[in-house]
A protein has these predicted regions:
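Short, basic, glycine/proline-bearing loop/turn elements
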Residues: 1-4, 28-35, 69-71
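Structural motif
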Residues: 5-8, 62, 99
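Histidine-anchored nucleotide/phosphate-binding helix
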Residues: 10-23, 28
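Short internal beta-strands
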Residues: 27-32, 55-63
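Short, conserved loop/helix-junction motifs that constitute active-site signature segments
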Residues: 20-24, 48-53
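Charged helix-capping and loop-helix junction motifs
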Residues: 41-47, 79
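Short, glycine-rich nucleotide/cofactor-binding loops
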Residues: 2-14, 34-40
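C-terminal structural segments of small proteins and small subunits
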Residues: 67-99
Length: 99
């Protein structure tokens, strides 16, 4: 299953809720302000780092660049472009958006 998170983890608890409910092996794609959850050295970075042992974590590269955090993305987070987003949606049987 593909889970998308579009809210900043510093504004809403969407990322926490996603991590608590996603099943092991799921893909988590951080988009829009959700990409702040992929940055290192923050209050949520340890939680996301731990989650990467159970999930594959992606961030939408255009959103990362737009927000000026490309140099702060954690090791292990895979950056994808819009075509990669489409591929993830096609590869997974279901998509859950966490708002």
């Amino acid at each position: 299953m593909l889970h998308t998170v579009n809210k900043s983890p510093f504004e809403k608890n969407s990322l926490d809720t996603c991590l608590a409910h996603a099943k092991e092996g799921s893909a988590i794609l951080l988009i829009e302000d959700g990409v702040y959850g992929a940055t290192k050295g923050t209050a949520v970075s340890n939680k996301v780092q731990e989650a990467m042992s159970k999930f594959t974590v992606y961030a939408l590269e255009p959103d990362v660049k737009l927000r000026g955090v490309a140099d702060k993305v954690m090791d292990g987070v895979k950056l994808v472009d819009y075509a990669g987003f489409v591929d993830l949606a096609v590869e997974n049987d279901k998509v859950q958006a966490w708002l």
